C-alpha cells in the first residue's frame, strides 16, 4: 500500500533499508559521532544498527587517522533485546538461559554499513572485517573485542581516541577493564 508523505515530514527510519548510501534516497546515516552536523539538519535519518554502532565507535578514530591497513577481527556478544521484538526459537529466555551461541558468522548484515562509514573517513579502507556475533545470556547491551594490527604506541592511540571523542558526551575512553553493567540501561559506550 502506498501513502503520501508530506515533503516537510522528518523521518528517522529504524530499519536497515536506508543505511547504505544510494541515489535512490536522501537518508543520512545517523551516527552522530560520524555525521553529527548532517544528522542534525537532515529531514531523513537512517538509524544505525546496534552491532554497527558498537563496532564503528571502536574503529572510527583509527579510520580518521588512516590506520586501518589490514583485516579487522571482531567478536561481539549481544543481549536478547538485540534480536528485536519478533519471537523466535533463539530469542526466548528458556533457550538463551545458560547459553551462548554464534550466528551469521562472517556474513552479518551490519558489515556493509560499517565498511561504508570507515571508508567515509579512510577512503583507502578495503580490508575484510571478520565479524563473529554471539547471542548472550543477558537481556541488554553489547560487549565487543576488536583486533587491529598497528605499530603505533598505545599512548598515541589513546590520545587519538580521546581527541576524536572529546565533544561526544556518550563515548568514554577508560583506562580500566570494563564490564557490561557499566553501560546497561544507559546510552553510554565505554572504550578500553
Language model feature labels by segment:
Residues 1-105, 123-124:
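N-terminal Rossmann-like NAD(P) cofactor-binding subdomain of oxidoreductases
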